[in-house]
Amino acid sequence: SPQGVSSAASDVYKRQAQMSGVDFSPASLAEARTLARRCNTPIDYHESDVFLAAEVLPQGNFDLVYTGIGALCWLPSIERWAQTVGALLKPGGRLFIREGHPMLWAINEDHHDSLRVELPYFETREPLVWDDENTYVETDSPLKATMTHEWNHGLGEIISALLAQGLDITGLVEHQSIPWEALPGQMVVDERGEWRLKEAPWRLPLSYTLQAVKRGG
């Protein structure tokens, strides 16, 4: 989301980077611009579906595309996302992802005493539909729109989609931690402020970091 990117982007800006961001929500963009000003970080934001980002941003012009954690689950097609990434990057440009692991998304979090794979690991045509009043954003106001639609994408599907768009994978690390309590009742906070399984954390990857470079640079 732009909110998350704004707070992280100040470090990138210190390296004299020119940054752009895309989101389909006018409200999210307004908040993102406020945070960017607060961080004294100029970011060129555009209101657009991420699949249309290559139509509102200059194609083949970016040195780095960053996809933040918790973004891919909102996208129905990982191939279309990879097409967008490939269209935006210049030859030699890099993609960086920190994302929740698809194995984690396949675990049913309603079981607070066990790990049960009960949800799709691979991309499906139809989304998972949730009706939930909870949000990761701190707010005192009740949510009016509580229905969400999500898709999982297997790690192989993600890698294959990027390879098909002319990117080479340069790094892939699976992590035993994630920034939020993804499995309530089964996690503890570690010394870095991230959450991990309190019992036998080696059982399940919770997130991953992927880096790739567009061929031709």
Language-model features, listed with the residues they occupy:
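Single conserved hydrophobic/aromatic residue that forms the stacking wall/gate
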Residues: 1-9, 13
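A short acidic, Gly/Pro-enriched loop at the edge of an enzyme's catalytic core
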Residues: 55-65
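Conserved class I S-adenosyl-L-methionine
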Residues: 94-136
